[in-house]
């Protein structure tokens, strides 16, 4: 009957049940069979039902194969090899789960022009995806519960002989799926729900972040001396009598940069001394291979996952005070206008005289504390030089956005007890200015010498992003002329005019940042738009960034030692592209991990704010709602379904969400109430303060409906409800 019905329906035309029966000449006695046929066709996605209850045959566009990516329990996407993505409704999963390879048919939506959807027809490959969940034990039976919402409608079956306890968080792999039942095999224990860090453990497991170093790396690092040995003093500039200092955060343990500043009659000498990691980490050693695999350190609220073993990162490579340390140094001679007169790169040895913190130096600049007179003089000279460098960069087109960020404060047990907005002081800006000049100087020298190198590059913003930035500013009543933006200086001049005529808040600064392209590593130099630098590399943090370590190696082997230069050039030319790609990739991964974990700990703190009113600013508008930012720089979501009482639509450019009566625009300040927190996902849900009471009524009705449905389902399972045919 299904084939008969389908043959006699015209595409994109709506038919009532009676019309279909009449067209197909179906006797009323067979209405139940027709109903079954129609519902089967609905399940297959071959027909759809409109709001009037009528049936519409849909156009088949093509057959596809791809990877099934489930977003939540209600929908998914199929991603194909040509990077196309097709929407799949829950009714059309047909047994597929996340990461399965599937075959599907793509249909044209009869409701929205140019909209398509897919229906899974066949599972091509069970890729045995991994799932993380927790164990509950009832009447001696172990039950596995997945954290991911997309799996909450499934029933799991796990081996009862596995060695796990109540609340253990475990990793399993899917063995098979039969009728919404997933059979899984135990892989390992990840954490426990009793830990304040279990959500963090889950993020690290999902990202396959390895904390511990392999045995061969630890064995190799154990052979490295924990002090500078006698032969290492040879052929180095001895700077141990100089007033060289470090300035870092309160919690910093890996000190990879130190400074010395001297003011002379007609110039400044800025000496930047960087930990000589390349002296200890040889190319292609076990430590080096692991460092490249990690490519960066990851900084979490409660710990650091280092790029190098602790013996190096916090030990022999760290420029700790009062001990001799090997350094890669650059002396930069700078005139009083901020121009670099000359530079000198060399290998040195230092003995840091002071381990200062940003807070200490800021207190000194604010006349809150006194220091050693010689140190005070150098710090004052340093501040003078920093301001000169800052003005120089400003003239070149650098925009110092000073975007406010928040830091999670944990107690001894690891629970979030506060969120602090970080304010940058003079000392933080000073170190940044000095490091930028050092990075520019090294990049310029490598380029001038025509040597293979690794650059930190940042392309010009696209015309599309500049146009969107202009539109965004106009919604805020700010004029900005896109066609004139042809260089960092042009962008900077336009932004300065905005600052002179309007009050610039954190949101506008974030919009500037969003307008920019992402900075990456490359063996090809195109300059750095954001820093207004023609040449820029990362030289100053080899303990925590692999590109810096690689750059040190290039300098040692091609600038300091010119033997076999042709062979060295060929060698590095072959590997630098891969090193750049790996470093860029791992940086993105690290930023994502840091953001996820910070969001989790922030959400944990916001549990105590449920039901409270907060001031917020709209920072992003998407098809499903709008993100807002609170005064402590934490984000929350107002889902479009929680914009109550009116029918809201999002503008195509994402600058506005509006109904017939109300408009909300990017940058607008609003009052909201926190209504829900998901610590596992690091999400905070809010509603407009004016909608709060209506939201509570809606939520109560929904919970009552769920409870009633659960009771009915239970009774149905127990045979207490008899449905008439």
Swiss-Prot record:
EC number from the UniProt entry: 3.1.13.1
One of the record's GO molecular function terms: exoribonuclease II activity
SUPFAM superfamilies xref list: Nucleic acid-binding proteins (SSF50249)
Keyword Nuclease set for record: yes
Main location: cytoplasm
Record-annotated RNB domain positions: 236-559
Keyword Ribosomal protein: no
GO terms (BP aspect): mRNA catabolic process
Reactions accelerated catalytically: Exonucleolytic cleavage in the 3'- to 5'-direction to yield nucleoside 5'-phosphates
Residues annotated as domain S1 motif: 611-689
One GO cellular component term: cytosol
Keyword annotations of the record: Cytoplasm, Exonuclease, Hydrolase, Nuclease, RNA-binding
Cellular compartments annotated: Cytoplasm
Role of this protein: 3'-5' exoribonuclease that releases 5'-nucleoside monophosphates and is involved in maturation of structured RNAs.
Family: Belongs to the RNR ribonuclease family. RNase R subfamily.
Protein name in UniProt: Ribonuclease R
Organism: Mycoplasmopsis pulmonis (strain UAB CTIP) (Mycoplasma pulmonis)
Gene label: rnr
